[in-house]
Swiss-Prot record:
One of its GO terms (biological process) is DNA-templated transcription. This is Transcription factor asqA. It comes from Emericella nidulans (strain FGSC A4 / ATCC 38163 / CBS 112.46 / NRRL 194 / M139) (Aspergillus nidulans). InterPro entries: Fungal_SecMet_Regulators, Transcription_factor_dom_fun. Coiled coil: none annotated. One of its GO terms (molecular function) is zinc ion binding. The gene is asqA. The keyword Calcium does not apply.
Length: 565
């Protein structure tokens, strides 16, 4: 590809990223411009990531996209067959058991063996194998320190490791457009995971759209007759509900509408019984009599259903706002929104109670309980299998992440000077804003402890993005409630922990380092604004007050742009 064409494509990629985050970055930069009398460019408060340009180029060596792997001495950019097996073996202990149980372990290995060429020097093309290898390369290389990362990244960031396998898999998928299969759907789901890890969020969204349409075309929204084999029925259910989960996660991440709608035509939820787990193709030992390795996936799905019910109810409500008016300009509308969200809190509590004890993270403080936001340190049972430890941690992480996204719309700027601001116990929006901050603090403390004491989250890109979401929420909370209240002080402390978390991730992939620098810069600006009692400065004129109010209403404290949702 000509160099200038590549540069132009890279520039468009950066602009696309900035367009995606415009509802956040533009408002925050505008606010800082006004309050600090300094120019802040929107993209300067977004982490630099692999999506800037590093997935746009092609192999420097081994330009034949379909050249078979031929051993460690080959000049091909693809790993040898032994190296491929080394990478895809990670899949079963990571993505398979902790994110997307959509492959049959035994069937995949049989499929891989069937691809091997007789002379043992290569294998036949397979989109599914390529994308599994790409995802596992991205994960594993992201667990290594920057100085120890393999030459397979070719000087690029670990988040784009495996990109040649990804591109080859994408090319192979084009041949399946008119002959869709279960394998096609599996590829689209895994592509979205790979793209999300590399922070290619628009491409991830497109991959998820393809997955949703493919799932409908394959009829996965309808259950198979009970006369067919249970293992086949359960695999189809797991595929459907994994697409459902990934669609929900994309909505939380991007603030866009759901692509897969709730309807009367939905398959039954997955079964996590010992019998079904035994026929799934995987051989993980049950952790308890009422819990198998499939229980984690089932609990994630039921949590997503609880979130979607609350999210849909809130965002489908007509608050009778004027054109261009955000909910944060109308205390009565904000109160009405808070009442809608509050109705779903018992459902979240019921979900916590429904989780099997074997999937819960115990606390070092015997008076604390799982999923709480009291700040108690968790017990990391290092003698438990790694897959089970990761499931426990990720389930609680997901719960806090869901609550942050659900309650964040209640954080807004007050009308009175900062010196008079406090979170009133009698204010329902204030209570939910406090809940939001508490969950962001809990997520941050949990992530920090796990990274400090274990390697469970090393290379886990989604944990980094959940942490980024939490710390930006905390910064918004501190700016909205800049007093010296207990929650604000705890939020400030958690922000500093979040910086340490980003730096930890930054030892493995560059976006972590970039995020750390951005948060440190925003902390400094927050301290400056607080010291100058910035809130009292913008009360002077009603028009100015409204503008500042809107900036934060949609920027940090609301995931989506209300007027364009």
């Amino acid at each position: 590809m000509p160099k200038r064409v590549l540069k132009g494509a890279a520039k468009r990629a950066r602009e696309a990223k900035h367009a995606r985050d415009a509802a956040k970055a533009r408002r925050l930069s505008s606010f800082l411009n006004v309050r600090l009398n300094q120019e802040h460019i929107p993209h300067e408060i977004l982490p630099n990531s692999a999506s800037d340009d590093k997935l746009l180029d092609r192999p420097v060596t081994g330009a034949d996209l379909f050249a078979p792997s031929s051993g460690p001495s080959s000049n091909s950019v693809y790993p040898s067959l032994l190296q491929e097996e080394y990478f895809w073996n990670y899949f079963w202990q990571t993505y398979h058991v902790s994110l997307c149980p959509i492959l049959d372990d035994a069937q995949f290995k049989q499929h891989y063996q069937s691809l091997l060429i007789a002379d043992g020097k290569g294998r036949k093309p397979s989109a599914l194998v390529d994308i599994v290898v790409a995802a596992c390369m991205q994960y594993h290389i992201s667990t290594l320190p920057l100085g120890s990362q393999s030459g397979l990244v070719e000087g690029k960031d670990a988040s784009v490791a495996g990109r040649w396998h990804y591109w080859r898999g994408q090319t192979l998928l084009t041949y399946e457009l008119e002959s869709l299969s279960i394998s096609t759907l599996q590829c689209h789901v895994l592509c979205s995971i790979y793209l999300c890890g590399g922070s290619f969020h628009n491409m991830m969204d497109t991959a998820m759209a393809q997955a949703v349409r493919t799932a409908y075309i394959l009829g996965l929204h309808r259950d198979l007759p009970s006369t067919l084999p249970e293992a086949k029925r359960e695999m189809r259910r797991r595929l459907w509900w994994t697409v459902y989960f990934m669609d929900t996660r994309a909505t939380m991440k991007l603030g866009r509408s759901f692509m897969l709608s709730e309807s009367h035509s939905m398959p039954a939820l997955c079964i996590d019984s010992l019998r079904v787990a035994a026929s799934s193709g995987s051989t993980f030992v049950p952790a308890d009599e009422d819990m198998t390795w499939l229980s984690f996936n089932l609990r994630q799905i039921t949590l997503c259903r609880t979130f979607r019910a609350a999210y849909t109810s809130f965002h489908n409500t007509d608050f009778h706002l004027q054109e261009g008016q955000p909910i944060w300009d109308r205390p009565d509308a904000l109160q009405a929104g808070a009442e809608i969200i509050a109705k779903h809190i018992p459902s979240l509590d019921a979900w916590c109670d429904s989780v099997p004890d074997a999937l819960k993270l115990k606390r070092q403080d015997s008076n604390s309980r799982p999923f709480s936001t009291d700040g108690a340190r968790v017990v990391l049972e290092l003698s438990a299998p790694e897959w089970l430890q990761r499931q426990r941690m990720l389930l609680e992480n997901t719960y806090h992440h869901v609550c942050v996204n659900l309650f964040r719309s209640m954080i807004c700027f007050p009308y009175q000077p900062a010196s008079q601001v406090h979170i009133s116990e009698n204010s329902l929006p204030g209570e939910l804003a406090t809940r939001c901050a508490a969950h962001a603090i809990a997520l941050t403390k949990l992530t920090h402890q796990v990274l400090e004491e274990t390697s469970l989250l090393d290379g886990w890109h989604e944990a980094f993005y959940c942490q980024w979401d939490a710390v930006m929420t905390l910064i918004g909370f501190v700016l909205a409630y800049p007093g010296s209240g207990t929650v604000t002080l705890e939020a400030k402390s958690a922000i500093h922990l979040a910086i340490a978390v980003s730096e930890n991730f930054g030892f493995k992939f560059a976006v972590g380092t970039s995020a750390s620098k951005i948060v440190q810069g925003l902390c400094a600006k927050s301290e400056t604004l607080t010291a100058n009692e910035y809130a009292s400065a913008y009360i002077g004129a009603s028009t100015q007050n409204a503008n500042i109010y809107r900036i934060y209403g949609g920027q940090i404290c609301g995931v989506i742009d209300w007027q364009n949702s």
